[in-house]
Amino acid sequence: MPPIYVLQQGAKLCINNRRLCIEYEGETLTSVPLAHVSQVVLFGNISLTTPAIDALLAQNCEVVFLSQRGGFRGRLV
């Protein structure tokens, strides 16, 4: 599965029914079955719920944090 890139500033990643959901201003922009996620790349001001972090780590998904312009900030493995 290719990485999931999230660029929408202010977006939030959460888990709903074993799906990784990307929400913005209370609306779900998209969702992907958690089983199809191998890596998530976040650009800038993106938040993750604790259940999303737990689910991604349990699935051995890498989460990469970048600045809005793509500078490396860190990662969860």
Language-model features, listed with the residues they occupy:
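N-terminal intrinsically disordered, cationic/polar leader segments
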Residues: 1-77
